[in-house]
């Protein structure tokens, strides 16, 4: 047996991980502007945390979850999404308490797990960035969160994104619509896919979300949720739409969009872009006002979204967006002879402690090979340190692009390299 990574996973190697770090850092910066703070939850939860909140009949629970019994016979699942664990944490840690500022705003980043057919941008271990806002039923919260997602996508460089918007109404509106959908689909049951025939019995709204051709045909003339909204639901949705328009945010009403999780109510949304003729959802979310109470907390409004990092990076690559990643070394020290080994170690460490990104040769190679390494690392400056330089205490620092040189003491480099760096045309932060 070859020792290889499991199917549906990937190794994120240094050239790629730099992109991941940029995206995650960029998201943190945007979220901070909106007063969000990071929360980190376990990657595994009790099975019921996911099954009861996401929905027993959803594809995630019935087909895709990684679940097992641990050595204490506890039913455990690897988290397939981020909202339910954050809500569980919110309730368990009593973050609904009066002394905690409302609304409470959290973001998270980390791996999720679903057993599904691996494909580009969709793996069995995937990574999600998401936000959750608790304690505000104000439709302005819906809009602020949607706009924050749009803000992130625009500034990171995603092109051609369209906002798809729908409402699922409150529980009363949803129940009325559910019955109308059953009445419409029941005569068409035999024309539906096998999965949608099952969904019709368990959760008919999920038929609207099916990607199967026969199901798409069947729901073409299905009733619209917009015809079943009561006054409260209509008022909320109208307010969301008006505020989006006030902020100049274009949107498309998509009444067949229901999202894959059972906990949503009122506003739901997706940001969709087209790649090679296919629509790809890059970010999605919505309101879930009943979920905190479902976990044993008080009635608390909630709104959030999630986006997949793998898919985001895939879209950026397909759209030719180059992330502004700085990988260059500030200094490379080429070492000549055993007599320079100790001093090279002292020097590279002194540079790092001054805040410079520095590397040295450890392999006793010929200078030509060391200079090539400096080029591979895109080193801005180059120091050649041999036994004669150690004895004299003087060394040449070279701009590795222009070949301009300055002669300086080793003591100056160890104490104030910034001055030399700037003299050679580079600027320190």
Swiss-Prot record:
UniProt entry tagged with the keyword Cytoplasm: yes
Entries under Gene3D superfamilies matching the protein: Anticodon-binding domain (3.40.50.800), Bira Bifunctional Protein, Domain 2 (3.30.930.10)
Catalytic activity line of the entry: tRNA(His) + L-histidine + ATP = L-histidyl-tRNA(His) + AMP + diphosphate + H(+)
Location relative to the cell: Cytoplasm
Stored InterPro entries: aa-tRNA-synth_II, aa-tRNA-synth_II/BPL/LPL, Anticodon-bd, Anticodon-bd_dom_sf, His-tRNA-ligase, HisRS-like_core, HisRS/HisZ, HisRS_anticodon
Stored CDD domains: HisRS-like_core, HisRS_anticodon
Keyword presence, Nucleotide-binding: yes
Keywords, ordered alphabetically: Aminoacyl-tRNA synthetase, ATP-binding, Cytoplasm, Ligase, Nucleotide-binding, Protein biosynthesis
Gene Ontology molecular function: ATP binding; catalytic activity, acting on a protein; histidine-tRNA ligase activity; transferase activity
Main location, first listed in the record: cytoplasm
GO cellular component: cytoplasm
A biological process from GO: histidyl-tRNA aminoacylation
Record-listed E.C. numbers: 6.1.1.21
Assembly and interaction partners: Homodimer.
Similarity annotation: Belongs to the class-II aminoacyl-tRNA synthetase family.
HAMAP family: His_tRNA_synth
PANTHER family: HISTIDINE--TRNA LIGASE, MITOCHONDRIAL-RELATED, HISTIDYL-TRNA SYNTHETASE
NCBIfam families xref list: hisS (TIGR00442)
Protein known as: Histidine--tRNA ligase
């Amino acid at each position: 047996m070859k020792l290889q990574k499991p199917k549906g996973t990937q190794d994120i190697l240094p050239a790629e991980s730099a992109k991941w770090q940029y995206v995650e850092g960029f998201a943190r910066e945007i979220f901070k502007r909106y007063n969000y703070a990071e929360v980190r939850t376990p990657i595994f939860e009790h099975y019921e945390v996911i099954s009861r909140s996401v929905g027993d009949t959803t594809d995630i629970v019935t087909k895709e979850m990684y679940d097992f019994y641990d050595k204490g016979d506890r039913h455990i699942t690897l988290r397939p999404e981020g909202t339910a664990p954050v809500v569980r944490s919110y309730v368990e840690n009593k973050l609904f308490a009066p002394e905690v500022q409302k609304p409470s705003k959290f973001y998270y980043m980390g791996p999720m797990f679903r057993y599904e057919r691996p494909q580009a941008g969709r793996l069995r271990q995937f990574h999600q960035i998401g936000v959750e806002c608790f304690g505000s039923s104000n439709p302005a919260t819906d809009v602020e969160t949607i706009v924050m997602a749009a803000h992130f996508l625009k500034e990171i460089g995603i092109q051609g994104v369209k906002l798809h918007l729908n409402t699922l109404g409150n529980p009363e509106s949803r129940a009325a619509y559910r019955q109308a959908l059953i009445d419409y689909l029941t005569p068409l049951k035999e024309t539906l896919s096998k999965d949608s025939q099952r969904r019709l019995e368990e959760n008919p709204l999920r038929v609207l979300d099916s990607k199967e051709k026969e199901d798409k045909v069947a729901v073409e003339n299905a009733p619209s949720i917009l015809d079943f909204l009561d006054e409260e639901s209509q008022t909320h949705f109208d307010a969301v739409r008006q505020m989006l328009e006030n902020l100049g945010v274009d949107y498309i009403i998509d009444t067949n969009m229901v999202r894959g999780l059972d906990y949503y109510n009122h506003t739901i949304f997706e940001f969709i872009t087209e790649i090679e003729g296919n629509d790809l959802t890059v970010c999605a979310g919505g309101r879930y006002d009943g979920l905190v109470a479902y976990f044993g907390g008080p009635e608390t409004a909630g709104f959030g979204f999630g986006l997949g990092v793998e898919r985001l990076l895939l879209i950026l690559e397909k759209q030719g967006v180059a992330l502004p990643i700085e990988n260059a070394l500030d200094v490379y020290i080429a070492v000549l002879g055993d007599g320079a080994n100790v001093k090279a170690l002292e020097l590279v460490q002194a540079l790092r402690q001054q805040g410079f990104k520095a590397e040295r040769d450890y392999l006793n190679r010929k200078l030509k090979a060391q200079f090539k390494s400096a080029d591979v690392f895109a080193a801005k400056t180059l120091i050649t340190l041999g036994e004669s330089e150690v004895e004299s205490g003087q060394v040449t620092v070279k701009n590795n692009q222009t070949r301009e040189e300055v002669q300086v003491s080793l003591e100056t480099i160890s104490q104030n390299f910034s001055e030399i760096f700037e003299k050679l045309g580079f600027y320190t932060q």
